[in-house]
């Protein structure tokens, strides 16, 4: 986000507004504004004028759960403003509500004309990205209908139907055409001397297929009360560290964000669930890997996230090969999209299985959840899903045929299918990309942990000793192979990946820290790796870089080739603690907490890789999610790893 854009989030709904609360309807660029629900823009213009002019911003919108600003008519120092407009906005579930309070500053009656230009273009989020792609929409029709107390925008394309309804209290005096698809709602307010008048506008988005009976909140204050109640329940029982107030504040901020970043999902029996979304603005939907890691980080404090995430992912687990070759039996979904382009197959992400690591992470979380909570009932309920996930790992995943979990670039989808999924993220030190199949190091660590944890479930919950022994042997064999094939003795470090010919992809990357978290490396190798990650080419002062500097492939602003990811560092910190490297774990934890403190105690999705010694403030990465569930949960992982030290 730029300093002119502000994000409001509630579940699967978010809005991006400017300093004065307006929505401009921009397309392309880093952060289009609007009201978004289920991948579609349900408000594309929302622009206020007073007496025909755009008011001046006295106090701009500030980031928070509601957008508030103070506006006045433009004028000079010799003529104080005739009135002041107090504007407040908030988002609810599928809704947007605004309060406009106009106060006269004059001792005589005045008349003020307020106009609000509104439009809904129903653009899919994928159309708004700055990748210059275009999508045909043959037969698409947009409609506008004036209501007694507002108006309704509609959109249809084949069987696809969406609408946005705007109502106002009091009703507008007129609804005017603008010469475009937008409409202008107009009120003429008669204000008594120093009097006040208030307008309340409510927007209800009805995306395709949403049959829920939703109610628009009566006011932004009602949304605020609901959010406070939600956050209060989310905080209950969490013991924040008293000796480290900055970590306590980061944990509190993270829990607040996790509370707002939960989106609806459905379990195997049709039960309604709420699970962590990927992040806003671009990924406010179920992402398998992201939901699993956020739930893992929060597990000691908020196990209900895992209790919802696991059934939701079981319900979307692939049951057979479909038109997508990636939907193989037992595989856990990578991404679920609800938008128009996904519905018509114009993007592959409606239910997309392009992740090599979501499946083992599903098993890791299931084992960790049962071990932590003692809730064996969930393990019984999801037994067939867990066995199917193991089956995928051994069969389509490649453990039996290749010895490792393996993926291949998906034409039209993701070239890389581990957590570093941007093009070119898996590379050699010189920047060249591997050819053929890819066996990413971090995914092998997850597979090892998944095999061991599922063996424990088989023995202690399912009573299947034979299956447990089989999985334990598979884990031991994987560990032996990995240290033989991935370890680079000349660099005393594991390779980032193996290519299709089994050659080592030799970039020095942060993924090695995930092997510590999984426990895949022998203690001697693990200690070497852990200390290496704290050397200056890796450690920026704000965290461990995704790629060590000094390599030709390094770029401090690259998404995955030199940046610093909080969730990546949270896993590294947990791994350092696991291998007894407590000083190193505290160093990384303090760096991340300092980065959070510099940004209002909120960790972003990703930071630039610039060193703290050359730039004393953390630098944000362009196009990153402002709020992201893994980053929100990362302070909780730090608390687990190092306590309040």
Model-predicted segments: where are they?
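Helix-terminus loop motifs that line ligand-binding clefts
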Residues: 269, 302-380, 387-401, 406-409, ...
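Extended ligand-binding clefts on enzyme/binding-domain cores
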Residues: 380, 387-444, 483-548
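Acidic/polar, glycine-enriched structural segments that form the non-catalytic walls/loops
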Residues: 84, 92-95, 104-285, 376-380, ...
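C-terminal capping/lid segments that line or modulate ligand- or cofactor-binding pockets
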Residues: 282-286, 337-372, 487-536, 558-645
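Structural helix-adjacent loops and short alpha-helical linkers that scaffold large soluble proteins
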Residues: 241-247, 298-310, 369-387, 398-401, ...
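Extended amphipathic alpha-helical segments enriched in small hydrophobics
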Residues: 440-464, 469-479, 563-599
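An extended acidic
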Residues: 1-82, 94, 107, 121-122, ...
């Amino acid at each position: 986000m730029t300093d002119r854009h502000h994000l409001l989030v509630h579940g699967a709904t978010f809005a991006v507004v400017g300093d004065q609360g307006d929505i401009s309807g921009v397309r392309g660029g880093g952060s289009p504004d609007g009201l978004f629900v289920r991948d579609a823009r349900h408000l594309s213009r929302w622009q206020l004028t007073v007496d025909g002019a755009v008011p001046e911003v006295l106090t701009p919108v500030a980031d928070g759960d509601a957008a508030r600003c103070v506006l006045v008519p433009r004028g000079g120092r010799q003529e104080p403003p005739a009135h002041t407009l107090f504007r407040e906005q908030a988002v609810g579930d599928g809704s947007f509500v605004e309060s406009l309070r106009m106060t006269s500053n004059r001792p005589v009656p005045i008349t003020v004309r307020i106009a609000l230009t509104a439009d809904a273009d129903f653009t899919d989020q994928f159309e708004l990205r700055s990748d210059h792609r275009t999508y045909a929409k043959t037969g698409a029709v947009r409609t506008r209908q004036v209501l007694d107390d507002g108006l309704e925008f509609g959109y249809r394309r084949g069987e696809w139907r969406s609408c946005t309804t705007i109502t106002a209290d009091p009703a507008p005096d007129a609804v005017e055409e603008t010469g475009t698809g937008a409409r202008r709602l107009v009120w003429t307010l008669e204000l008594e001397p120093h009097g006040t008048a208030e307008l309340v506008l409510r927007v209800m988005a009805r995306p395709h297929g949403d049959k829920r009976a939703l109610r628009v909140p009566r006011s932004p204050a009602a949304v605020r009360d609901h959010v406070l109640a939600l956050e209060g329940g989310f905080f209950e029982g969490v013991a924040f560290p008293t000796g480290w107030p900055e970590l306590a504040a980061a944990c509190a901020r993270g829990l607040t964000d996790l509370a707002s970043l939960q989106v609806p999902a459905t379990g195997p029996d049709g039960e309604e669930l709420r699970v962590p979304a990927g992040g806003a603005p671009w990924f406010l939907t179920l992402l398998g890997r992201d939901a699993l890691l956020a739930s893992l980080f929060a597990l000691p404090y908020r196990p209900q996230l895992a209790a919802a995430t696991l059934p939701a992912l079981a319900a979307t687990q692939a049951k057979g090969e479909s038109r997508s070759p990636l939907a193989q039996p037992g595989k856990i979904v990578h991404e679920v999209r609800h938008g128009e382009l996904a519905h018509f197959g114009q993007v592959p992400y409606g239910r997309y299985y392009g992740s090599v690591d979501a499946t083992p992470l599903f098993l890791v979380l299931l084992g960790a959840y049962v071990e932590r909570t003692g809730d064996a009932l969930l393990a019984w309920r999801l037994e067939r899903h867990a066995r199917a996930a193991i089956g995928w790992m051994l069969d389509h995943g490649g453990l039996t045929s290749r010895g490792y979990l393996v993926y291949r670039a998906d034409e039209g989808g993701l070239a890389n299918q581990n957590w570093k999924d941007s093009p070119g993220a898996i590379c050699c030190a010189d920047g060249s990309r591997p050819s053929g199949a890819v066996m990413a190091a971090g995914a092998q660590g997850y597979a090892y942990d998944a095999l061991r944890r599922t063996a424990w479930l088989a023995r202690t919950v399912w009573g299947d000793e034979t299956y447990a022994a089989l999985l334990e042997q598979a884990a031991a064999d994987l560990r032996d192979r990995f240290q033989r094939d991935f370890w680079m003795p000349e660099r005393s470090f594991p390779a980032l990946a193996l290519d299709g010919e089994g050659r080592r992809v030799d970039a020095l990357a942060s993924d090695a820290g995930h092997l510590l978290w999984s426990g895949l490396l022998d203690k001697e190798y693990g200690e070497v790796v852990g200390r290496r990650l704290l050397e200056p080419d890796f450690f920026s002062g704000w965290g461990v870089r995704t790629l060590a500097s000094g390599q030709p492939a390094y770029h401090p602003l690259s998404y995955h080739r030199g940046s610093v990811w909080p969730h990546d560092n949270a896993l590294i910190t947990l791994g350092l603690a696991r291998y007894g490297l407590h000083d190193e774990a505290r160093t990384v934890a303090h760096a991340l907490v300092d980065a959070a403190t510099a940004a209002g105690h909120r960790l972003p999705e990703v930071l630039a890789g610039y060193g703290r010694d050359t730039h004393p403030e953390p630098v944000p990465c362009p196009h990153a999610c402002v709020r992201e569930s893994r980053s929100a949960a990362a302070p909780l992982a730090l608390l687990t790893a190092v306590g309040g030290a």
